[in-house]
Amino acid sequence: MTLGITEVKKGMVLKVEGDLYSVVKTEFVNPGKGSAFIRTKLKNLTKNSSIERTFKAAEKLESVELEKRNMTICYTEGNDIIFMDSNDFEQMPVSKEYVEDILPFLKEETPMEVTFYEGKPIGVIPPNFSILEVTYAEEGLKGDTSGTAQKRVTVETGGEINVPIFVKQGDVIKIDLRDLTYVERVSR
């Protein structure tokens, strides 16, 4: 769908020079002299980078519709994660690169939203939090409490994370997947 610059809004997906971009920020400028333009901040959906781009009033932009499907992780195979569609149970490989940094904190059957463009997966939106059991934790040292004392633990999926020294083996913890930080202990 073709759009004029005044129709571009935050959250839209545009095709610019063959790449897909999500509109992060827009600023419409109408100077007293000259023609209007729009200043945008765009996030590349396939390369995970951001650019700032200015479009002139006469330019036409191409808006694209993305398909979003609720899927769950089945297993990993090579460089792919095999996802299963929650509606029709179809299995589909998706590149690990979309969730590589948080993969050690994801259990099988974790629900996620997978984004498709023209039938091909182009992104994965993971949940914000993961609740996991601590399988290995060293004992915290008594008196080691200056500042925010932390130690490294291993969780049931094999991932390692820094936590406060009071967390021990067998505890269930909540991890924020957006920045891979400890949130809290969770009661069973």
Curated annotation (Swiss-Prot):
InterPro entries, per the entry: Elong-fact-P_C, NA-bd_OB-fold, Rib_uL2_dom2, Transl_elong_fac_P/YeiP, Transl_elong_KOW-like, Transl_elong_P/YeiP_cen, Transl_elong_P/YeiP_CS, Transl_elongation_fac_P
One Gene Ontology CC term in the entry: cytoplasm
Predominant place of localization: cytoplasm
Molecular function GO labels: translation elongation factor activity
GO aspect biological process, one term: peptide biosynthetic process
Gene3D superfamilies, A to Z: 2.30.30.30, Nucleic acid-binding proteins (2.40.50.140)
Pathway: Protein biosynthesis; polypeptide chain elongation
Cited PANTHER family: ELONGATION FACTOR P, ELONGATION FACTOR P (EF-P) FAMILY PROTEIN
Family stated for the protein in its record: Belongs to the elongation factor P family.
HAMAP family: EF_P
Function: Involved in peptide bond synthesis. Stimulates efficient translation and peptide-bond synthesis on native or reconstituted 70S ribosomes in vitro. Probably functions indirectly by altering the affinity of the ribosome for aminoacyl-tRNA, thus increasing their reactivity as acceptors for peptidyl transferase.
UniProt protein name: Elongation factor P
UniProt source species: Leptospira borgpetersenii serovar Hardjo-bovis (strain JB197)
